[in-house]
Amino acid sequence: APFQSGIIQENEIKSAGSQSELAIAVAGTGNEKILYGLTLGIPFVNYKRTSTFTEADASTALNNFNYAAIEEYLETSGSGVNLKLGIIYRPAPQWRIGFSFHSPTFLKLTDKYSATVTTDTENYKGLLTQSSKEFTNGDLAQYSYLHFTPSRMLASISYVLREIEDVTKQKGFLTGDVEFVNYRASSFKVDPASSDQTETKAYYSKLNDVIDEIYRPAVNVRLGGELKFTTIMTRLGMAYLGNPYQNSNGEKGSRLQLTGGLGYRNQGYFIDLAYVHTTGKDIHSPYRLSQQPFPSAQISQRGARVVLTLGVKF
């Protein structure tokens, strides 16, 4: 029977994860005005996501459909490598002008996935449930692939308060930088160890075409300052992260970040603790249709994270 009262759609998503990086850096100076550095980064990724999408009959009438739901579980883990190159020029003792290039990050990722579909068709078939694990001997389906993130180019300028040779007696600095990221350069490729090379290559070719259509280059702007009290530092900063989407379907990806932190420097050892508060707006679409409109939820983002950095200079 046709639905007279419509369908109620609901999408519940729970996600958690982390991204850490082991950095191996070297730095040097050509003269008193030029400094340079090279960093080898080894990132580690861990992510878990559970999504439940439900469509339910808005009425209580018996029409051979009560609800249908699909619950998906995704676990992603992996590691990779990247390079960062930077140079700082000092036109005057108090000023610093910097340029840096961050290479694409090469990641080898592994997805573990399962899906469970539940339907209640009332008098027709009643309540039925089927899981993808029934086809994988009760295990999560597993698949590995390669992912390349876009490169980044940065330009920065800073002013040092009370510039003297003894850095422990400097009072702080003000800084700003501009970053360019071409998100369209993000791409996925087949893991060379994959057994279904031809079919998978065709899928990733289409996926990369979609990335090229949806994303665009973006500019990120950051401003900040630091005050030094011998070995203790206090910091404040803000960042505006530009929208990476072409807005073909109303996507909004810009974000504003406000940061406060403390730092400790003594005899080559350093500890940095920062709090980052993020706000932004976006949309979420549980599914997309190519030939007709599809539903989207408006999202107001409010997030916070704490970043701890430990290091030693030698």
Residue ranges and their predicted role:
Residues A1-F314:
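Outer-membrane beta-barrel porins/channels
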